[in-house]
Amino acid sequence: MWAADLDGGKPHRARAREAQRWVHLRPGDDRTLVLDHPAVLVQRTTAPEQPRRLLPAELDESCLEEWGGQVVVENHVNVLRKVEPESPLTARLLVALLASDALDRLYRCLTGSVAVSAYELAAIPLPEPSTLLTWANYDDTRLAQEIESYYRAQT
């Protein structure tokens, strides 16, 4: 999966990368290179002229099935996985947060670089778990409004 496959919020097959869709895996490579569980993917590098720095996409179960049950993610893609099963921060909420104009503006304040590092993603202040639990019940439109309001109030 290439970074170009992530624009638009959902992974897709960018035609420009079709000729490069091959990789030779050696024994043991699957432990580190193959992604076979849902995750949130974020482009790791952007061009200065791009209007956004944070370009997330949710790799959910149905998307994984569409891609054959597993993908190899190239090095210009950050892979964000849920490490605390009880966390109220779902993939849907994380994608909505990262796709918001508010977080994109905040991220630009944290860094002047066009690169999106895992370290800087981890530094983004997130709402309290109780807020996330409330947001989980909202439809996409209301969720986007709540995210904008929340971060506007924080500044």
Give short role names for the model-derived ranges.
Residues 1-133, 140-154:
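Polybasic, glycine- and aromatic-enriched phosphate-binding surface used to engage nucleic acids
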